[in-house]
Amino acid sequence: MKKIVSLMSALVISVVSFAGISNAADSKKPIVIPTHNWSSQIVMAHVIGGIFESMGNNVKYVNTDSQAVYESIRLGDVSLSHEVWESAFGKSFTTALDKGGLVDWGDHEARTLEDMGYPNWVAEKGLCPGLPDWTALKNPACAKNFTTPDSGGKGRMLEGPQTWHGDLIPQRVDALGLGDLWTVKFAGSADALWAELVAAEKEGRGTIIFNWTPNFTDGAGFTFIDFPPYTAGCRPEDGGDGKCGSPDGYLKKAVNADFPKTHPAAAATFKKMSFSTSHIGAMAALVDVDKMTHEDAAKKWLADNKSVWTPFTK
């Protein structure tokens, strides 16, 4: 009988302890949310921050490097990441994950693609017949339609900031034998990519830029080039020859390992958060098309989409 009573007491203590943890109030310390250098990520940071604030949490935003942020999360300097793009940041994410201190917090509904492509009017004007097949880029007549003053007589591809992918695209161009006809330049920011789309159309020349989906361009007419398919290990950094495009990838969330303990309610809400391609594209469009500030875009998105985000808090 004593053993039964002792066992029942232990069970009661366990249940009470678990309930105490699950119902614990979030810490008053701010939830530190990172911002990077593309619109959807910054707007979503403020969307998520707004949701946390509606729950009574304090929020702090910090501008961080998009590769180094996972180490910052692991060490506890940043609380979470809400846009972990597989192609660009998967390696940095996995490295931090393997060290411990960072936790995979699930995927968004949206799937991602990050690669080089062109606005649809490039094909409509016949500037490079054969696209989106990458072999169309082997034609000198195609390349000459994409020259710019800084391209040395070659067709120019405009990559994103070099901090995003390093030399991935230049390595691919050389590996595919396109280096004699094409050169890769790096944009200073995402805004520079969108400015290039406007400038190229105004000047009547072709343009190939780095882009991604989900993004505001999903509804504006943009096509990704069909490079040879991605396979595990095909990139130079993994020992491959570099003759491959980008993978169809995840869009993950990540948190510091202590976040579910310090902010259990916010962590549970963040776990439930899952945005679709259309949600994320709309966030970006409010800034890149409608020219709103990131903060105002987030406020508008939250006001217009209560039915989307309110269930995350339940």
From Swiss-Prot:
Signal sequence range: 1-24
Positions annotated to bind trimethylamine N-oxide: W38, W85, E114, W164, W212
Pfam families to which the protein is assigned, alphabetical: OpuAC
Protein name: Trimethylamine N-oxide-binding protein
Quaternary structure note: The complex is probably composed of two ATP-binding proteins (TmoW), two transmembrane proteins (TmoV) and a solute-binding protein (TmoX).
Subcellular location: Periplasm
Alphabetical keyword list: Periplasm, Signal, Transport
GO molecular function: transmembrane transporter activity
Species of origin: Pelagibacter ubique (strain HTCC1062)
The UniProt record lists the keyword Protein transport: no
Gene Ontology cellular component annotations, sorted alphabetically: ATP-binding cassette (ABC) transporter complex; periplasmic space
Segments forming a coiled coil: none
Main subcellular location: periplasm
Outcome of swapping W38A: Maintains a relatively high binding affinity toward TMAO
Effect recorded for F89A: Severely decreases the binding affinity toward TMAO
Gene transcribed to yield this protein: tmoX
Keyword Signal assigned: yes
Function (record text): Part of the ABC transporter complex TmoXWV involved in trimethylamine N-oxide (TMAO) import. Possesses a high binding affinity toward TMAO, but presents little binding affinity toward betaine, carnitine, trimethylamine (TMA) or dimethylamine (DMA).
